[in-house]
A protein has these predicted regions:
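Intrinsic disorder/low-complexity segments
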Residues: 119-152, 339-348
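Short, glycine-rich nucleotide/cofactor-binding loops
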Residues: 38-44, 196-200, 277-284
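N-terminal active-site beta-alpha-beta segment that forms phosphate/nucleotide-binding
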Residues: 53-118, 149-251
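Conserved phosphate- and dinucleotide-binding cores of soluble alpha/beta proteins
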Residues: 219-220, 225-399
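PLP-dependent amino-acid enzyme catalytic core
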Residues: 25, 31, 37-47, 77-94, ...
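Short, hydrophobic/aliphatic alpha-helical segments
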Residues: 39-55, 87, 181-189, 273, ...
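Positively charged, low-complexity intrinsically disordered leader regions
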Residues: 2-45
Length: 399
């Protein structure tokens, strides 16, 4: 998407790859909206750390980052032994997989890269690696490079990662096309967390219908939940919408029910980090379940927008989804930029952490929750909008 900085407008993707330096290039999302900065990860360990530490976040964005990270790790290998190369790839794969356990997209993305590598003639290394994890690749993408030597496999890895990222953008465009039909002139929408272009390679999932509706000339308004404890709604979604000229207000997380009760919200669209293909259950940022319950209570449609890589075809229950628990400090305080007018010790213009909670109290910090399928009106995918219960019936098409 386009970003305007100091009067200059430029197009950016959330994640790209510098093949010359073998580096992943990311937008440092922890600094937004106060500072726009690009960072580079020099090896797969730094790439995994960038995912874990939320320099990059959002299921589709960390999926593309994982794909690039696997290719980065593959290209860093020095040697000719395919057996040693396979062991190295396993190490890279497992480190990146462990960075954010709730999202299924990184695993699916890396399996897609492995599938692309397996297209080379006599590439049993990647055929074997494709079976090492539970999530199955949904497609085979590869470059017209054949051979079973390490250098050919490295070239295939990068080609597959690039194609995964480009396909992710195409899927977001399709999500926007299908989801825009839900947005009418004068609509007031609610979105939770950030499922915009910053959470993807470009365009976004939950925001894709908004941008498509905007391009079609429709007028609407968006409420952004602040989304404590990391405030991705207040910091990232609000920044995105401001950059694109979409009318919006940031609201406290607990204000959504009040606005629904007063008839001020017509539609809810969120993203997701994992949707179960068997049941339609949805894992997303903590607080999504609460919004879905409120929407159901007030008869408001609740939609979830996802790329195909977010669908998990293996787990049978939402209770099986691993829920990441993050550091308690995120709940006990907040990051921000001092205005210089607040209490003593807060310096103007300086990004810093301020403790809010009682000094002797501890906190619990589950980062995600699971919304049962019965609370979800529909799943917006690149192939259309489906009822949650339809996913399994359409698995041949969607998988």
């Amino acid at each position: 998407m386009n970003v305007t900085l100091r009067g200059r407008t430029q197009h950016f993707r959330t994640v790209t790859f510098d093949a010359v330096k073998n580096e992943v290039v990311l937008i440092e999302q922890r600094l937004l909206p106060h500072e726009f900065k690009l960072v580079r990860t020099r090896d797969f360990r730094e790439t995994a750390a960038a995912i874990r530490d939320m320099i990059v976040r959002g299921a589709p964005a960390i999926a593309a980052t994982a794909a690039y990270g696997l290719a980065q790790g593959a290209r860093a290998f020095r040697g000719k032994s395919l057996a040693a190369f396979a062991g190295h790839l396993r190490k890279v794969y497992e480190m990146i997989e462990a960075a954010r356990p709730t999202a299924v997209d990184p695993v699916n993305a890396m399996n897609t890269v492995l599938a692309g590598m397996a297209q080379g003639e006599g590439a049993p290394v990647c055929d074997r690696l494709l079976t090492i994890r539970h999530a199955q690749s949904r497609q085979h993408v590869g470059a017209p490079v054949h051979g079973n030597d390490v250098s050919a496999q490295q070239a295939l890895a990068l080609a597959a990662a690039e194609e995964f990222a480009n396909q992710s953008v195409r899927e977001c465009e399709a999500i926007g096309k299908h989801g825009a039909k839900l947005i009418r002139n004068g609509s007031n929408m609610l979105t939770h967390c950030n499922a915009g272009w910053l959470a993807c390679v470009d365009i976004g999932t939950a925001t894709a219908p908004m941008y498509a509706a905007q391009a079609a000339g429709r007028k609407f308004h968006v409420f952004c939940d602040e989304t404590r404890p990391r405030c991705q709604g207040a910091s990232l979604t609000a920044w995105e919408l401001a950059q694109q000229g979409v009318p919006h207000h940031v609201i406290a997380d607990n204000a959504a029910g009040h606005l629904m009760q007063r008839g001020e919200i017509d539609l809810v669209i969120t993203g997701s980090d994992r949707v179960l293909g068997r049941t339609g259950d949805v894992a997303n940022k903590i607080g999504t379940y609460t919004k879905a319950v409120l929407a159901k209570r007030h008869g408001i449609p609740f939609y979830v927008a996802i790329p195909l890589s977010t669908i998990d075809w293996n787990l049978k229950s939402g209770f099986e989804i691993p829920i990441e628990v993050r550091d308690e400090s995120e709940v006990l305080g907040a990051w921000g930029v001092g205005t210089g007018t607040a209490e003593r010790g807060v310096r103007g213009g300086k990004r810093q952490f301020v403790r809010v909670a009682n000094p002797t109290s501890s906190a619990r910090n589950p980062a995600f929750d699971v919304t049962p399928a019965e609370l979800v009106t529909g799943i917006i995918t690149p192939l259309g909008i489906f009822k949650p219960q339809e996913l399994w019936k359409r698995r041949r098409e969607l998988a």
